[in-house]
């Protein structure tokens, strides 16, 4: 029987930052589509990661593991991928979702106060780390049909205020790398490389950024500047990732898909 194009049966995935928020929603949704094996990463909360895997198992996940991984580890790519391959007892990674990101409000500063160490930390975590993971995954992609999906941000398309400026630049760098990877490796690897450009979404990161502004600012911003007049939910993003992960998205490559409910500030940047 031919497998339905939306099905992820018999496929294996890595989802970074899968213990909570968008990453958790992505992990759960992929298993709703039949994903067989899954590795998720966490930074400190193993219990949250195991909770995600428990939900995934309810959806029929055959094998799932949680891997502690730090985006600031210069060897994150090799270490993570080797642990995933061994733990899932597989030679192949069909789907890679780079969702984990870094933004520390205690270090956020205006451009006049920006220091090289802070700049390097944000760029390493949000640009180098996902590229390192992709590089380590490439030899283990399937002969055809591999999927690499990077979670980006509407901040990559905007002129951002000082505290978010470096974060936005790091995500713009990730977008650029993704387009280049699609151009460079789509033929050789028969894989797709795409980003999902996420607007205001209710996650821990959303609340972290919210601390940089007056109380309620982020919620009111989303209502005022989003056509949907609400803040996004993690599942909204997971649905788009689920599409990109499947055969249905085989003709989408090098794209940055907007997932922002019609965020008006971003719309001119996409034209």
Curated annotation (Swiss-Prot):
InterPro entries on file: NAD(P)-bd_dom_sf (IPR036291), Sc_DH/Rdtase_CS (IPR020904), SDR_fam (IPR002347)
SUPFAM superfamilies cross-referenced by the UniProt entry: NAD(P)-binding Rossmann-fold domains
Naturally occurring in which organism (per UniProt): Emericella nidulans (strain FGSC A4 / ATCC 38163 / CBS 112.46 / NRRL 194 / M139)
EC number: 1.1.1.1
Keyword terms: NADP, Oxidoreductase
Residues annotated as the enzyme's active site: 152 (proton donor), 153 (proton donor), 167 (proton acceptor), 171 (lowers pka of active site tyr)
Catalysed conversion reaction: a primary alcohol + NAD(+) = an aldehyde + NADH + H(+); a secondary alcohol + NAD(+) = a ketone + NADH + H(+)
Main enzyme class: oxidoreductase
Lineage summary: Eukaryota, Fungi, Dikarya, Ascomycota, Pezizomycotina
Name assigned to this protein: Short chain dehydrogenase asqE
Pathway: Secondary metabolite biosynthesis; Alkaloid biosynthesis; Mycotoxin biosynthesis
Keyword DNA-binding belongs to the record: no
Positions of NADP(+) binding: 22, 70, 99, 167, 171, 203
Family annotation (Gene3D superfamilies): NAD(P)-binding Rossmann-like Domain
GO terms for biological process, alphabetical: secondary metabolite biosynthetic process
Family to which the UniProt record says this protein belongs: Belongs to the short-chain dehydrogenases/reductases (SDR) family.
CDD domains linked: SDR_c
Transport recorded as keyword: no
Function noted in UniProt: Short chain dehydrogenase; part of the gene cluster that mediates the biosynthesis of the aspoquinolone mycotoxins. The role of asqE within the aspoquinolone pathway has still to be determined. The first step of the pathway is catalyzed by the nonribosomal peptide synthetase asqK that condenses anthranilic acid and O-methyl-L-tyrosine to produce 4'-methoxycyclopeptin. 4'-methoxycyclopeptin is then converted to 4'-methoxydehydrocyclopeptin by the ketoglutarate-dependent dioxygenase asqJ. AsqJ also converts its first product 4'-methoxydehydrocyclopeptin to 4'-methoxycyclopenin.
